[in-house]
């Protein structure tokens, strides 16, 4: 059992617990949000659910080496990394850089992602925190992807060239 992949999976699970709570609360307290805001939040929750599957499978693979198939881990970690970076970009782009404590003076339109709750400032802060933890989750998945690539290459998953001449015995 290797320690570094195990620590990475636990870090991913901690970030996922926090993200599930934050984004789940945004969904639960949704009151007449715009369609584009709902789509961004729902996509983020889809990415979180996918990340749960990858992190739990990675945790099982880190504990039980017989389950760890390097190519499968590589594909799972690559997919989770890709979806996490897309969700982080979507949340950051849709949110912008607001002052969540002073939304009255902001110039955002009625379709802005933080509008659509009884307490828009709370929703704004939860989405801000969700964006930060999505980027932290990306760092953890990127590290796991790097380890998966190294493991895949170590087990002979890549094409290696070696000496092709055989020794001639006279």
Which positions does each model-derived feature cover?
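Signature of small four-pass
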Residues: 2-19, 23, 37-98, 137-151
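Charged, low-complexity, helix-prone segments enriched in Lys/Glu/Asp/Gln
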Residues: 22-27, 123-128, 153
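Juxtamembrane interfacial secondary-structure elements that flank transmembrane helices
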Residues: 27-31, 89-106, 155-156
């Amino acid at each position: 059992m290797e320690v570094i992949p195990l620590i990475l999976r636990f870090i991913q699970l901690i970030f996922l617990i926090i993200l599930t709570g934050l984004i789940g609360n945004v969904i639960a307290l949704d009151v007449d949000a715009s369609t584009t805001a709902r789509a961004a939040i729902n996509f983020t929750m889809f990415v979180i659910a996918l990340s749960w599957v990858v992190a739990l499978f990675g945790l099982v693979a880190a504990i039980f080496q017989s389950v760890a198939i390097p190519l499968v881990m590589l594909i799972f970690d690559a997919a989770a990394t890709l979806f996490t970076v897309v969700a982080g970009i979507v949340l950051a782009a849709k949110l912008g850089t607001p002052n969540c404590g002073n939304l009255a003076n902001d110039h955002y339109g009625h379709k802005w992602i933080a509008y659509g709750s009884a307490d828009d400032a709370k929703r704004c802060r939860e989405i801000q925190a969700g964006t930060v933890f999505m980027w932290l989750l990306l760092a953890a998945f990127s590290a796991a992807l790097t380890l998966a690539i190294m493991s895949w290459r170590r087990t002979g998953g890549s094409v290696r060239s070696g000496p092709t001449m055989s020794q001639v015995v006279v």
